[in-house]
Every structure is written in C-alpha cells, then in structure tokens.
Amino acid sequence: MSIVAQSAVTHFRPVMILAGGTGGHIFPGLAVAGALRARGVPVVWLGATGKMETHLVPKHGIEIQTIAVSGVRGHGMLALLGTPVRVLPAIFAAMRVLRRYRPRVVVSFGGFAAGPGGIAARLMGLPLIVHEQNRAPGMTNRILARVARRVLSGFPGSFVAEEVVGNPVRRDIAALPAPGVRFAGRSGPVRLLVLGGSQGARVMNDALPVVLRVLSDADVAVEVRHQCGEALRAETEGAYAYAGVAARIEPFISDMAAAYAWADLVVCRAGASTLAELCAAGVGSVLIPFPGAVDDHQRRNAEYLVAAGAALLLLQQDRAFYVYLESVLRDLLSNPMRRLAMAEAARRLAKSDVAECIAEIILKESI
C-alpha cells in the first residue's frame, strides 16, 4: 500500500526510513528526514499498515509505503510459535518495496515494520543503520544491530558497540536560552508543567490535584499547566475542580518550546524523546516512568538523568507514591537553587544538532 505525499520519481536514489508504531520511533525519524531533505536528499518511509505512521508521515510531505505486520511481544506462546509464518510474508513484502525504490541506505528507528524492512535490506546487500532511542533497546533494533553497518544510540549503554549521538529534538527547543538566563528575575508562584503524553497519564491526573491541594494548604504557591490528552480532559478538569486547585488544563500543547521556556519544573513520563527535550531545554524534572513500558525502558532512561543530577525518579507502583510525590514536590517547589542546579545538569546532557549528525552519517554510508 502506498500513501503518496511527494512524487516517487526522482533522479536520486532515496534514503529509506523504517519507523513506526509509536511517536517515540516516528518523531526522531521525521527529524532526520527533515535534515536529509534540507540537503536535497529524497526520503521514502516504510511503515506498518494501519499504524500511527500512516497518518503522521504524509503530513510532512513524505511518501510512505506500508506492509502488513504486527508485533510479537506480549501476545503469548502461540503468537511466538507463529512468528515465522507472519514475519516471512512481511520480509518478502519489504523486499518488493526495496526493489522498487532501490534506496541508497536503509535506516531503522524501530517499530513494527523495521524488523522485516531491516532484514530485507541486509538480504539484498543494502547498507543498514540502526538508531535506538532508549537505554534498553527494543527487540527489533537488538536483532538488527547485529547486522547493521552503523549502530547509533540516544543514550550510552544501549549496545556494546555503539555511537552515542543522542535523540533529535526540535530546533526551537534546542535554541532556548540557558536555564540561568530564563530563571533570572522570576518571582511569584513556581511554574509546574505536567506532561501526560498524547494519551494522557491517569496516575498524574489523579495524583497531582490531590498533592497540590495539600501543598497549597501549606502555603506553597504553584501555577500549574497540565497536558492530559484529549480522552482524559474532562476527567482531569474534574479532578482539579474537586481538589480546589486552579490549573490550566490542555489536551495537547502545540508549542512545546514555549512550554519548556515557561516552566520551572516538569513532571512527566520518561520516554526517550521527552527526556531529550528536557535536556535540550535545560529544565529539571520529576520522572514517573510508565510501568508497562517494554523491558522497563522508561525507568532505564530516567536513571540516566537521575545519575547526572538532572531529575528525580518516582515509581507509580510504589505503595507510598502519593507520599513520595508530595515530599519531592514540597522540596523542589520551595528550593529555587536546587531547581536551577537540576536544570543546568539537564542542559549539560544535551546533544546538539543530532538530526544533522545522523543525516551526515547516513550520507557517508550511502551507496
């Protein structure tokens, strides 16, 4: 299946990007695609039929081809035993796409289609580059890393043989002033930014209003901006209203650079792209990893920032989660010097011009 947003006819062999399933795979791929296209390099995308990438990628003017493939993990022993039956047709479908476009290099950012696409690329003798966003690499990239020409990572320690390049972030976030400049002269309530992700995070929607009410009773002044996801908007508004806490509730924040610039502290999940943004912006955070993340990769991501002094880590499955959250926020909201130190530590972890760096590596490996 083909969803066309730019002509497939070109005088140059394209770069093929393999990415999909979640925004954590797709958005880094889009950033690198933008860097390649800015150099006049055509890009074509291989994704999975019916997944998120089929809607997002064409909006950026990139042609996407899709193959029928689904994930294996978490679907039981019968699914695992049936993997060859399901994966082999996907590999053959990917090979047909590769023969049609004859890409100069294939780049995997992970996701459903990346496995068949990467295997097909190597079977056809095409250069394969892997970029892993998380500290705990996904199964697809773990497999492909064994046969890839270059293995790139967003965090150190993902692979034994790796090149740590970081994760791409938007230019407007990376261009924000240093924390010391942003925080200088600020007064009034502490600005707390809560990020639940595009789908929202119910634990944050439930816990933050309760904890902030306790803190307000203790005369801790806070201005809250809470991004909750469209599906949980009414629920989140109700929780804050019931707690008697004023907050700006938003299902989606389109200008994340402005949001980070506004914030004194962030409470959020620990996806790789979000953490890259926190570092690029230079803002301290309280990280609550999603406990259902594959291989507990969000916790592994969070531990990297914690070790550098850029964040604090809380586990929502802890029986004393509310107590710990209240204690942590009470300390951070009343301690501007600690917030600044965390923000500066985050900024020191930032990698600059990541998309351009990856694009340069891709072009060096092109055939």
UniProtKB/Swiss-Prot annotation:
Instruction: List locations, semicolon-separated.
Output: Cell inner membrane
Q: What reaction gets catalysed by this protein? A: di-trans,octa-cis-undecaprenyl diphospho-N-acetyl-alpha-D-muramoyl-L-alanyl-D-glutamyl-meso-2,6-diaminopimeloyl-D-alanyl-D-alanine + UDP-N-acetyl-alpha-D-glucosamine = di-trans,octa-cis-undecaprenyl diphospho-[N-acetyl-alpha-D-glucosaminyl-(1->4)]-N-acetyl-alpha-D-muramoyl-L-alanyl-D-glutamyl-meso-2,6-diaminopimeloyl-D-alanyl-D-alanine + UDP + H(+)
Q: What class of enzyme is it?
A: transferase
The residues that the entry says bind UDP-N-acetyl-alpha-D-glucosamine are 22-24, 134, 170, 198, 253, 298
This protein's major location comes to membrane
Q: Which UniProt keywords apply?
A: Cell cycle, Cell division, Cell inner membrane, Cell membrane, Cell shape, Cell wall biogenesis/degradation, Glycosyltransferase, Membrane, Peptidoglycan synthesis, Transferase
Q: Name one Pfam family in it.
A: Glyco_transf_28
Q: In which pathway does it act?
A: Cell wall biogenesis; peptidoglycan biosynthesis
> What is this protein's function per UniProt?
Cell wall formation. Catalyzes the transfer of a GlcNAc subunit on undecaprenyl-pyrophosphoryl-MurNAc-pentapeptide (lipid intermediate I) to form undecaprenyl-pyrophosphoryl-MurNAc-(pentapeptide)GlcNAc (lipid intermediate II).
Q: Which NCBIfam families match?
A: murG
Q: What is this protein called?
A: UDP-N-acetylglucosamine--N-acetylmuramyl-(pentapeptide) pyrophosphoryl-undecaprenol N-acetylglucosamine transferase
